[in-house]
């Protein structure tokens, strides 16, 4: 099956950094994990987990909008947090973008993410 790489205009460019935001195979879009960078590649909310989570979800929503979809089309998510104490803040922001029934989501804690 052929794949198509897509660079949405609504989020920061990934040119030269070794990954793409979106790949399409058949009728399915695969979207890379989103981080707290604005469209110009600037970090949003340094030290503010709620601002960073909001930007990541805003990026995801912008990509889906550009592809003609919506957050309601998501069938599986994976969430990475660097600190378990951030879970309540993460959920507060997530609940601004999603409501019950939520898509399946695997949550994992890791040492660091793509932006420090």
How would you name each of these model-derived features?
Residues 1-58, 62-75, 81-116:
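N-terminal presequence-like segments and the immediate start of the first folded domain
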């Amino acid at each position: 099956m052929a794949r198509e790489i897509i660079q949405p205009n609504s989020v920061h460019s990934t040119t030269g950094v070794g990954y793409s935001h979106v790949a399409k195979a058949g009728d399915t879009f695969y979207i890379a994990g989103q981080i707290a960078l604005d469209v110009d590649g600037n970090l949003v909310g340094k030290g503010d987990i709620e601002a960073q989570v909001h930007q990541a979800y805003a990026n995801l929503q912008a990509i889906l909008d550009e592809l003609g979809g919506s957050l309601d089309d998501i069938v599986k998510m994976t969430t990475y947090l660097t600190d378990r104490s951030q879970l309540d803040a993460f959920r507060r922001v997530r609940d601004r973008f999603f409501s019950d029934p939520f898509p399946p989501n695997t949550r994992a804690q890791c040492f660091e993410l793509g932006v420090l």
